[in-house]
């Protein structure tokens, strides 16, 4: 008997950055999301989306410290956002992202059950109790269940978290991560 594997195209990883000295916070955030962690001490901190998976090649997130060039840009951008020339438009942009997280640049993680999704949301809502460094750094922007006001679909529950600990891009604007459970 011959077994043939079906080859599919899939998103295999998300590359993220964290601020200098915040590797432990990035790890704590991955743990809140329910990820399995692999940290060899090298430049990359790896998180397996499904903790029991065998490989770090697919279904993974990688995080590394920002480059010095990005950190210099981040600092200049934060200065401009904090009372500088970008304060008003930056504030409006971030407020809109928080009000309508479905419209933000984000990536999603699917959970196998509504209970696992709800447990993850609960961990995030109480993150500061377990990791004080995450206080004010990760929050739930919104939870949209089928039929709820603001829900875009009846096929899944979507929860959006916002963090400035990790980002796939600039940390100054934060990162939204969609957590979802798909209705069977």
Task: State the predicted function of each range.
Residues 5-10, 15-75, 122, 141-146:
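Core segments of cupin and vicinal oxygen chelate
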Residues 2-3, 93-97:
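Short beta-strand/turn micro-motifs at beta-sheet edges
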Residues 62-94:
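Charged, glycine/proline-rich intrinsically disordered loops and linkers
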Residues 34-37, 125-137:
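A common structural junction motif
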Residues 137-154:
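Short proline/glycine- and acidic-rich turn/helix-capping motifs at secondary-structure junctions
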Residues 149-184:
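Acidic, proline/glycine-rich low-complexity IDRs
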Residues 9-21, 74-82, 95-124:
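Vicinal oxygen chelate
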Residues 16, 63, 109, 161-163, ...:
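Hydrophobic side chains in beta-strands
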